[in-house]
Design a protein with these regions (language model features):
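Active-site loop of short-chain dehydrogenase/reductase
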Residues: 7-8, 35-37, 80-95, 128-130, ...
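Catalytic loop of short-chain dehydrogenase/reductase
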Residues: 82-114, 119-127, 139
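C-terminal substrate-recognition "lid" of short-chain dehydrogenase/reductases
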Residues: 166-189, 194-195
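Conserved mid-core segment of classical short-chain dehydrogenase/reductases
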Residues: 23, 45-61, 79, 104-107, ...
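Conserved Rossmann-fold SDR core element
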Residues: 35-37, 116, 126-140, 182-189
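Catalytic Tyr-X3-Lys loop
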Residues: 37, 45, 52-72, 91, ...
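Amphipathic alpha-helical dimer-interface segment in Rossmann-like NAD(P)H-dependent oxidoreductases
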Residues: 27, 65-85, 123-124, 128, ...
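Short-chain dehydrogenase/reductase
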Residues: 1-33, 46-48, 54
Length: 206
């Protein structure tokens, strides 16, 4: 798709739960393209637990997948941009659930809450070379054991009767990358899902 639009696209793989692999990723991209102006932290692990099944092991896996790599990649972009005398942007993909909490997916939610806090702190600490922002989607793709009908029902459980699509999220990310006066804030792109308090994750209510 990117090539059809006249853009050059390459795929890079890394186990982001491994610190050395995470730190090596951006330099590899720079070597291939010559420069990097933005990082979108979209990789995420999504495993179920709740207050009754919480464990150190799962919390650590969620932290190593969802929180720590985003910080390392922001560090790497900052170093690269400073060396170039340039500016750029990091966008962290969060979750509307941070504004509409329930006890499902406890460790995942905690890891995203830490990333939301890191978004603010990184925006302060990496300025002026790097702006750091967040995008918090709602129900966007099938997850877990959801079937198509359940997903469609969950997707409509918002004030706007629609949640986010991948295209909605991409537009929000692009807007933030292209907006040089915005940093340290998060756009909620969820059809208003965060305005509706729910006792459980929406996938269990559809």
């Amino acid at each position: 798709d990117c090539a059809a639009l006249g853009a050059r696209a390459l795929t890079f793989q890394a186990d982001l739960s491994d610190e050395a692999a995470a730190r090596a990723l951006l330099p590899a991209v720079v070597q291939a393209f010559g420069a990097v102006d933005a990082v979108v932290n979209n990789a995420s692990d999504f495993e179920y637990d709740d207050p009754g099944s919480f464990s150190y092991a799962l919390m650590e896996r969620q932290w190593r997948a969802n929180t720590a790599p985003a910080i390392v990649l922001a560090q790497a972009l900052h170093e690269h941009l400073q060396a170039r005398g340039a500016t750029g942007c990091v966008v962290n993909l969060l979750d509307q659930k941070l504004w509409n909490q329930n006890p499902d997916y406890l460790s995942h939610t905690l890891s995203k809450a830490a990333l939301e806090a890191a978004t603010t702190m990184l925006a302060m600490g990496l300025a002026p070379a790097v702006r750091v922002c967040g995008v918090a989607p709602g129900v966007t793709l099938l997850s877990g054991a959801m079937e198509d009908g359940e997903f469609e029902a969950a997707h409509r459980m918002t004030p706007l009767r629609r949640s986010s699509t991948p295209e909605d999220i991409a537009r929000a990310v692009r807007f933030l990358i292209e907006s040089p006066a915005i940093t340290g804030t998060t756009l909620l792109v969820d059809g208003g899902q965060h305005l509706q308090a729910q006792p459980r994750d929406v996938m269990f209510l559809a």
